Amino acid sequence: MKIAIDVMGGDRAPDEILKGALLASKEVEGEIVLIGPEEIVKNKGLPFVSASEIVKMDDPPLEVLRKKNSSMHMGLKLLSEGKVDAFVSAGATGPLFLGATSIVGKLEGIERPALGVAVPSLKGATVLIDAGANAKVRPEHLVDFAFMGIAYSKVLGAENPRVGLLNMGSEENKGPDDIKRAYQLLKEFLGDTFFGNVEGHDINLGTVDVVVADGFSGNVALKTMEGTAKLVTSVLKESIKDGGFLSLLGALLMKRSFDKMKEKLDPRSYGGTFILGVKGIVVKAHGSSDAKAIKHAIKVAEKGIRVNIVQEIERGISHVRNSGDGR
């Protein structure tokens, strides 16, 4: 098992990326391959590939194709050639997404790959797709997202995943025309597997196993959840601090429970999002990822390798399309 990491991708590159890779190397099996300028990646105790160029966070998407010696391009190239089993990058979404679709290639029958992320819910995890790759989509694309989300959810352990369409209300007639059209298509293709419209709060409640959205709405929902998680933990800390001795004593007695809650709410624990619908495992880590987030992103990639997520999605899409009922 080999997982390549873009050492130069992200706001905190290269230091936090290197720290995260070293942390992950102690917890994952197989090799972690560093990709970046030789003077930065050598002598770190991990295999490396020298890359002289960098795709910057503000670079337009096409730069990933132009900069053939960049860490991002070379990582995707290694993946497409089968020399690594997964590629992780905290680099800019646009270039990474274009590179994944152009260099690694799209799965047959998928017009628009999407970002899929498993976010914590009261029932375990909810797959949110698309989490930020496609700002504007057609209703037909949302059906493809549902197929990929179902397959991903099954990989996570759901036996009969149910799908919800993110909307401004639960009623069937809510939302703009494209969403109404998507509702009808999902109802037609998925049958009883389609739950109907869901709202933002349903994602963390676990009302459904898969929430389908355009990339703009999905990304806003994801970032809102991240902010809410930080708010909850910050308010809890302040309340304990302001509550005096008894509050501090109670917090000490409940430290293990609080730590578990904090870990579950910590956005860094999500690790990263899969670019679903391409022929290899590509994980997009948050642009502001620190070492902990990078470590978890690499572990997400490891899990994708272990469960053969690309093959499962390919098989799941074929099965769902043929069955027409989402199972």
Curated annotation (Swiss-Prot):
Q: Which reaction does it catalyse?
A: a fatty acyl-[ACP] + phosphate = an acyl phosphate + holo-[ACP]
Name the enzyme's class. transferase
Enzyme Commission (EC) number: 2.3.1.274
User: Which Pfam families did the record assign?
Assistant: FA_synthesis
Spans traversing the lipid bilayer: none
A GO molecular function annotation here is: phosphate:acyl-[acyl carrier protein] acyltransferase activity
Zinc-finger is among the record's keywords: no
Tell me which UniProt keywords the record has, alphabetically: Cytoplasm, Lipid biosynthesis, Lipid metabolism, Phospholipid biosynthesis, Phospholipid metabolism, Transferase
Under which pathway is this protein filed? Lipid metabolism; phospholipid metabolism
Q: Which GO terms describe its cellular component?
A: cytoplasm
Q: Does the keyword DNA damage apply?
A: no
UniProt-listed InterPro entries: FA_synthesis, Phospholipid_synth_PlsX-like
Query: Could you tell me where this protein is found in the cell?
Result: Cytoplasm
Gene Ontology biological process terms in this record? fatty acid biosynthetic process; phospholipid biosynthetic process
The record's note on quaternary structure and interaction partners says: Homodimer. Probably interacts with PlsY.
Known NCBIfam families for this protein? plsX
Q: What does this protein do?
A: Catalyzes the reversible formation of acyl-phosphate (acyl-PO(4)) from acyl-[acyl-carrier-protein] (acyl-ACP). This enzyme utilizes acyl-ACP as fatty acyl donor, but not acyl-CoA.
What protein family does this chain belong to? Belongs to the PlsX family.
Q: What is this protein called?
A: Phosphate acyltransferase
